[in-house]
Every structure is written in structure tokens, then in C-alpha cells.
A protein has these predicted regions:
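Active-site neighborhoods and metal-handling regions in enzymes and metal-associated proteins
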Residues: 1-384
């Protein structure tokens, strides 16, 4: 169970983020956003997207009511003069005041539910041109993704907890998988393990047997498990996203499939070893391409993207042949190399030249791979 006590974040009775750390996080993000506004000659910015709301508020504010929706029940306004507002309807106001914005320095602006006039009211308060992270008449489109990429200490503390708990939930579900279960059953037991921890599933690609080999994105279709199951998921809490994939096989793992996992782990190791400050998206794509060829699977990179940085998006960008995006310090990554039914995927953090696995599952079989003298560990298949 997690909750705010004052401005501290307490999880299961332990303080995860102190009030001082949270205050520092909020102030740093506010300053960064005001600098962004001044650099872009904007009087203010409207923030509606859930990932940006979570980023700006240090994971404190949850505006999501409709789960699949990218926006919630309020809009934030930050002005170049440093003022902060949230716009919402009168029916949402009591909960937002009590449970979301009570510890934050945001001024509410309220409307009847049938007469939301956020854009006009925001323009008047800002007194000049407005940017927005969602389209709108008279608004300048802006992306806040570049501001989100480098994670601060408080974000890393939350991320470590989320990674460890998502990994634990995944292993809990994996150990409950039995032949005869449907793909929907696999989704249900995994969702239960996550939701009990206060974690929201955001991507579900669960499949069994030949569907794993045939499809890279195999959404559940109700097939019943005979021998081989894949739990491929993303989870969210405090706006942060975790990616993890794990497998279980009943009976001896076929040698051909075991070889594909070994090769995928080697590609993963090559990507992790190359994930260093200053590396570009194109550099990393080339590393994956060369690694597949070196493992005897040339061209395998064509069949699916290889992953990229994560954080407040399941992928903030993905590695592409001409990608110009650049790796920064304190950035999270989720690489997902795969070879026809064999795949490895974890969420890791690059911090001061060191790769930290946030979703380690030491109770599962391990695949060790070395690149240029450095060893990297990926999860193998649980064989029952």
C-alpha cells in the first residue's frame, strides 16, 4: 500500500521518498518547464497527457478515470511567470482537492461539467501564446518528452520499487501457470498480482504455444496452454512504465528454442553494453543488427523493433537506422530482442556508466552473456 503522508511517499510503512526529496523534485521540474516556456516564447503550457501530469507532479497526481485514455479529468497550466493552475469540473473538484492536489501549489479553476472553457480561461490567465501537449485550436503543439528523459533521485527510488514489484508479480503469476489455462486466464492471474500491489497493467501480450512463434505482438485470443506460455507486459504506477517478459515451458525445452533464447540474450547484452551516454538511436540499431548477424540470425532485426528508452512512456523512442536521439545519464531502457519464439526483456537504468536491472528475477533460470569482458544476465525459460 502506498500513500502520501504530508509530502512524503510511504509504501508498506517505509518512506520511499522524503518530503525534502519530493520538494526538490517538484521545484527542479517547475524550473525546467519555465525555462522551456521562455526558450519557446510561450506565456504558458497546457498539460493534459497523463504521463506529463505524472512527471510534473512527481507521480502524485492521478487524473485517469477512463483507463485507455491518454488524458484525464483535469488540465494543468504552468505559466512563464511561474504560476500553476488546474482546470476541472465542479463534480471532480472535491476528490482532486482532497486526494491529488492538496499537497501541491496549484490553484483550482472550476467549471460546471456541461460548460468546460479551459482554453479560453487559460489564455486569459497566461496573458499570451499557449503551448499544449494535446492538439487544440490556437494552441502551439509542444512535446515535453525531452524534459522527462533524465530521471531524478526521487523518480529512481519510485522506479526501483515499481520494477521490483512488477518482477515479483510476474514471477508469482508464472508459478501459477498450468497446462489447460487459457490466455485469458494468464492475463487474469497476472493482473491480480499487479493490482494487489497497486500497479496498473498497461500492455498485455500474452500467448501460448505456436502463437508465440508466429506473432511478435500476440494479444490474448483465448487459446489453451499445452506446453509453452509467454507473459509479456508493461505496468504503470506514479506515471512510470516498466516492461518485462517471462516464459514457462512444460517438459524439456526444445534445443532449437533454447538456442534462440541464448542468441537473444547475447543481442540483449550487446545492446546493454552499447547503452552509454552519447550513443545515438542509429548507433544502437546498428549494434543490434550486427549482434543478430554474429549469432547466426542475420536480418532478424527487421521483424520487430528492438526497444529503447522508457520512463513515462512504455518507449520514449525506439532505435532506428537513422535515429538521431541520444542516450543521456539517468535514463531507463527496455530492450526487447527476439528470435522466433525466444525473447528477453527487462527494464534497466543507466546511471553513471553502470547498467542496473530494475526487473531482475533471480529465482528464475538465468542466461549469462559476455560482451567485451562485461557480463549481463537475462531471464531464461522456467521449465516445469
Amino acid at each position: 500500500m502506498s500513500k502520501r503522508i504530508g509530502k512524503s511517499l510511504v509504501v508498506n510503512g517505509a518512506t520511499l521518498v522524503t518530503e525534502a526529496a519530493w520538494n526538490a523534485e517538484l521545484e527542479a521540474k517547475h524550473e525546467k518547464l519555465v525555462e522551456f516556456l521562455n526558450a519557446n516564447k510561450l506565456a504558458g503550457v497546457l498539460i493534459r497527457r497523463n504521463e506529463n501530469v505524472a512527471w510534473l507532479t512527481g507521480g502524485a497526481v492521478e487524473l485517469r478515470v477512463l483507463t485507455p485514455c491518454e488524458t484525464g479529468v483535469a488540465t494543468l497550466l504552468v505559466t512563464a511567470a511561474g504560476k500553476r493552475y488546474y482546470f476541472t469540473t465542479e463534480n471532480e473538484a472535491p476528490r482532486l482537492h482532497d486526494e491529488e492536489f492538496g499537497a501541491l501549489d496549484f490553484e483550482p479553476v472550476l467549471f460546471p461539467w456541461w460548460a468546460d472553457d479551459t482554453n479560453a480561461a487559460a489564455a486569459k490567465l497566461a496573458g499570451g501564446p499557449l503551448g499544449s501537449d494535446t492538439p487544440g485550436a490556437g494552441l502551439t503543439p509542444v512535446s515535453l518528452a525531452p524534459l522527462r528523459l533524465a530521471l531524478g533521485d526521487a523518480e529512481i527510488a519510485r522506479y526501483r520499487w515499481l520494477g521490483a514489484q512488477t518482477a515479483a508479480a510476474t514471477v508469482e503469476a508464472l508459478n501459477k501457470v498450468e497446462p489447460g489455462m487459457s490466455e485469458y486466464d494468464l492475463e487474469a492471474i497476472t493482473a491480480a498480482a499487479l493490482l494487489r500491489r497497486g500497479i496498473l497493467p498497461s500492455v498485455y501480450l500474452f500467448a501460448v504455444d505456436d502463437r508465440i512463434l508466429k506473432y511478435k505482438h500476440a494479444v490474448a485470443r483465448g487459446n489453451r496452454l499445452e506446453r509453452y506460455a509467454m507473459l509479456n507486459l508493461c505496468s504503470r504506477k506514479w506515471g512510470l512504465a516498466i516492461s518485462i517478459t517471462r516464459f514457462v515451458h512444460f517438459g524439456a525445452l526444445p534445443a532449437e528454442l533454447a538456442e534462440r533464447f541464448r542468441a537473444a540474450a547475447q543481442v540483449n547484452a550487446a545492446l546493454l553494453n552499447a547503452t552509454r551516454v552519447g550513443a545515438t538511436s542509429a548507433d544502437l540499431f546498428a549494434v543490434a543488427q550486427a549482434a543478430y548477424a554474429a549469432q547466426g540470425f542475420p536480418g532478424e532485426e527487421r521483424f520487430h523493433h528492438q526497444g529503447g528508452p522508457t520512463g513515462y512512456g512504455e518507449r520514449e523512442w525506439i532505435a532506428t537506422p537513422a535515429g538521431a536521439e541520444v542516450v543521456v545519464n539517468n535514463q531507463a531502457f527496455a530492450w526487447n530482442p527476439s528470435i522466433r519464439g525466444g525473447k528477453v526483456e527487462d527494464t534497466v537504468l543507466l546511471r553513471n556508466g553502470v547498467i542496473e536491472n530494475l526487473t531482475s528475477t533471480p529465482d528464475l533460470p538465468a542466461l549469462e552473456a559476455k560482451v567485451k569482458g562485461s557480463e549481463y544476465v537475462a531471464a531464461g525459460v522456467l521449465v516445469k
